[in-house]
Amino acid sequence: MTHPQKTPLYDIHKERGGKIIDFGGWYLPVQFTGIIDEVMTTRKEAGLFDVSHMGEIIVEGPKALEYLQKMVPNDVARLKPGKILYTPMCYENGGTVDDFLIYKMDENKFLLIVNAANTDKDFEWLQENNTEGVELKNLSDEYGQIAIQGPKAEKILQRLTDTPLKEIKFFNFKEDVDLDGVKALISRTGYTGENGFEIYIKAEETAKLWEKIEDAGENDGLKPIGLGARDVLRFEVCLPLYGNELSPEITPLEARLNPFVKLNKTEDFLGKDVLVNQKEQGLERVLVGFEMIDRGIPRTNYILMKDGQEIGFVSSGSQSPTLDKALGLGFIKPEHDQEGNEIEVKIRKKTAKAKIVKTPFYRRG
């Protein structure tokens, strides 16, 4: 039996009182001071996240762009060096292999940031379909990754560098930034809905940088944030979580990722026929947001009903600390997708009333 892997920050999390769990084969902190406190800290001050478990895959070669255009439904051709694209990646049947970010390093080199639990599966799928002869490298073990998110994130990080961070726009990145002696790639991205950055460094420099950022933010309320709060933060802004809102059985169109599926790009891509067919014939289910009217918290895989009939299931649900409401995401038959429409959630043996609401639930300022 293989033991979970440790990120370069494992010892620091233990020192800070992090409650460590096995998350998708990694030892990671689920919480430090408590989920509600950590969510509100990130929304109001700034939070520091260990995301070193995420996978890093390099795609390189003269045909790198041609290859990626085949592999993903988004249009990688419109990406310029220094910019980032979010995309799903599909199987031939339209189901989702993963969703990830693509960083364009230069004309023939791209960096993919993939979900931790999917890294090996993604790498195999990328290799299996590599008829273009591009070079594929899984460099996940060489990278550490730290995210700093929240209204004070930029102010705190700026204390460590002369590089003007305000010049790094949303979904842009800069390489070789000197953070108090640590060389880093910095992007203005995140999984919280707040302003902030994701920072890529050599694995062996991760702990040193983490402590430098902690010191820089100690008077601004910066705190370490665990996976529990990270999940609530992404849920409040309705960002999909692989395994919940995306899976091999769920297509990007069902998950409402239409802006990231370019059916009219000139290149064919894996899964295109199925997605075109779904768009033309209509979807059998669609992702919606809902708010509880009755007491109760919707949990993953609870059944959704209308007039006593099953119409779908919950993909994610939580009490929202930011909005002080019980909210859910779930897949339902499209005919029930009208804002304000009342549905029921089967919570244990009872049903509780809920209503369809607009997403995202929360938008920053």
UniProtKB/Swiss-Prot annotation:
Source organism (scientific name): Natranaerobius thermophilus (strain ATCC BAA-1301 / DSM 18059 / JW/NM-WN-LF)
GO molecular function: aminomethyltransferase activity; transaminase activity
E.C. code: 2.1.2.10
One record GO biological process: glycine decarboxylation via glycine cleavage system
A single Gene Ontology CC term: glycine cleavage complex
Source superkingdom: Bacteria
Top class in the EC scheme: transferase
Protein name (record): Aminomethyltransferase
Biological function: The glycine cleavage system catalyzes the degradation of glycine.
NCBIfam families per record: gcvT, PRK00389.1
Keywords, sorted A to Z: Aminotransferase, Transferase
Subunit structure: The glycine cleavage system is composed of four proteins: P, T, L and H.
Family affiliation: Belongs to the GcvT family.
